[in-house]
Curated annotation (Swiss-Prot):
The modification 4-aspartylphosphate is found at residue 78. Residues 151-245 bind DNA. Keywords: Activator, Cytoplasm, DNA-binding, Phosphoprotein, Transcription, Transcription regulation, Two-component regulatory system. Pfam families: Response_reg (PF00072), Trans_reg_C (PF00486). The keyword Phosphoprotein applies. It is found in: Cytoplasm. The gene is vxrB. PANTHER family: DNA-BINDING DUAL MASTER TRANSCRIPTIONAL REGULATOR RPAA (PTHR48111:SF21), REGULATOR OF RPOS (PTHR48111). GO terms for biological process: regulation of DNA-templated transcription. The keyword Translocase does not apply. Its main location: cytoplasm. This is Transcriptional regulatory protein VxrB. The lineage of its organism: Bacteria, Pseudomonadati, Pseudomonadota, Gammaproteobacteria, Vibrionales. SUPFAM superfamilies: C-terminal effector domain of the bipartite response regulators, CheY-like. Phosphorylated by VxrA.
Amino acid sequence: MSNQWWDEWAEKCHSKAHRQLLFWRYLVKQTLLLVEDDKNLADGLLVSLEQAGYDCLHAETIADVKQHWDKADLVILDRQLPDGDSVQHLMDWKKIKDIPVILLTALVTVKDKVTGLDAGANDYLTKPFAEAELFARIRAQLRSPDSGQDDSKVVTSNLTIDKATREVFFNGESITLTRTEFDLLLFLASNLGRVFTRDELLDHVWGYNHFPTTRTVDTHVLQLRQKLPGLEIETLRGVGYKMKA
């Protein structure tokens, strides 16, 4: 893509929402550090996290954590590691880089939770756990104003959109979309439950209002439904579209 073409296109994108879409494409992909010595659990969780669009690092011991810490945007941290209790080192690690930490542990008492949170953890999830809950907690921490992280992905129960790489995963499978299909999907998924008229979608996604026909929106919605079967984009007759939460 030439710089001249990009500049001309960006000038047409007068709406704030569409300028944000352009900016999102340059955000850095988020990296998670999983600190877990249970090989089976770690292997399965790493696969799921990568399918959700995250880059992943893995450490099995306290000794391995320090070399990875400054590369991560969030840490999923087991407490009971082969070389000790990880929370005893948490304050020191956070001095290297203050990033969100989710403790994922079999220690379940109130005292255990208080100890972990007082040591600097941002969240505490006990084993056994549901992946969906862990992923929701990850998303919550990464979009928190206190995390200092860019929210470079849109994630729902079955959909992951990476704004930086323009990759889309639906039900764990990679989906190839055109540029406009991607922009439309990203906009709707970023505004779950909100209703938009066809003219509003033309403005936000295409970047200008004067387009030959609003049927263009209908065509692209149809293409998204065909490429992502089961995607819940609802048609409100006589009004427009919304994506269900």
